[in-house]
Amino acid sequence: MFKELEEINSRPAPFQFYTAKELWTDEHTAKKMLEYHLNESLDLSSRNKDFIDRSLKWIVSHFGIGVNTIIADFGCGPGLYTTQFAEKNADVTGIDFSERSIRYAKETATRKGLNIDYVCQNYLEFETEKRVDLITMIMCDFCALSPTQRKKMLTGFYRLLNAGGSVLLDVYSLNAFDQREEV
């Protein structure tokens, strides 16, 4: 009995459990996550509005986003970036696990008259014949993946990219990890 309790209370190894499905598809959790995405002053599910505005300005300028740019945004959430890419006349696909966030993103696109292809799916399983110029994965999603999942994502990205295409990953620096203390 003590051995079982010890096992139950032991710290799991990094990436021992993959809980994305539970996190993004549970109705209560998904509702709160969407609220956090849409709160413009917090850096929880999405960056704060000022950061998003500054980063979008840089992304659009740096990658020359416009009429013929094809973009896939992995972990797009409620479309905070995809909407603005589409407003620059880019051809945009957003992929996210959360049905609630995808529904919100689709409603926003419809209301604004934007043609954005939203896919509600675990982005680790996303496949398409379409090739893209830019892949984005914003808000440190890449950091949450195991080394095996990261390799799978990068391999998938390679297959999706047009010649000369780019990948933009928003990741924590090693310095940011050093400043955190696990409790």
Protein language model regions, located:
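Conserved SAM/SAH-binding beta-strand->alpha-helix loop
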Residues: 98-100
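Conserved SAM-binding strand-loop segment of SAM-dependent methyltransferases
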Residues: 111-125
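N-terminal auxiliary segments of SAM/dcSAM-dependent transferases
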Residues: 1-24
